[in-house]
Amino acid sequence: MASYTGTPFNKYKLLDDAYRASGIFETGDALIPHPRETAEKYVRRKNMSYFINYVKPIVDAHINLIFKNEPVRQNTSSTYDLFLNDVDGNGTSLTRFMKKATIRAKLHGVEFIVIDAPIIEQGTIVTKQKFIDDRLYPYLYLVSPSNIEDYVVDKFGRLIYIKYSVENDTIDKDGNKRVISEDWTLTNDFCTRSIDGNTERFENTIGVIPMIPVYGTINNSDDLIPQSDMYAIARTNLALFNACSEWREITRSQAFNLLVYPVGEDDDYEDVDSLNIGTSDLLLYKNGHQQPEWICPS
């Protein structure tokens, strides 16, 4: 029989896969097998599954209208324009970055923007040209709520401590890909970064945590990380994904009738263990006086 562990789907993976029609919906692993379903039939049903996406159109309908026109920004400088056109060191404009952040905030309920800057060694002379060439101005990156390990807010709801992890893909000296996990702790006074057991501590010179939560809707809860209003829709999409597959399986089963054949008392009726009830097998029964016929589920 097809195996089923009963492990719940990760909430944020379900949301991401539903939005992109990828992951568990692409492979069919979102289908929950029937208790008596064979592994072969379950694999076949996964290969025949199809996904009707309701999550992405709803999210995009809310977000695309906001970014229909380029925002008007005034009183900018030449150095600030550098940042506007490249906020992450990968040539991403601020508008494009904020649209990505807003989509993920709508999908996850909240998304965190971290503001950081390269470390400049003490005594280094930074000219304007060096500032530009070495990209020594701040950069942004996103942190999903699934990466938040712990946090503390005061009685006013202000974030005063947060711990999170991010993965950073690099190439080692042998040219092989290496995934490094960075564990960050941010407070109003200091920040720490741990990589492979080595921890660095930095003074927080700005006095506030350089992380901004972006919410997909007004957060009326007391939680820094609220429940996503898209989660119920993603769960409904999951249920419909399973229902469509099950209904298609019933339709296919009814499309091919099952031959039932009566067997007399003197007929050989010993080797029947190899026969399985299904549309592709023969169903034998004893003491029947009717003629062979085809039946199908009603």
Protein language model features and the residues they cover:
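Extended, helix-rich architectural segments
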Residues: 1-136
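N-terminal start-of-domain structural block
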Residues: 1-31, 191-228, 240
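Generic low-complexity segments that are intrinsically disordered, proline-rich and/or Lys/Arg-biased
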Residues: 34-36, 58, 72, 139, ...
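Intrinsically disordered, low-complexity boundary segments flanking structured domains
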Residues: 94-103, 126-129, 135-139, 145-153, ...
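Extended, regular secondary-structure scaffolds
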Residues: 106-108, 112-223
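Extended, charged amphipathic alpha-helical segments
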Residues: 199-298
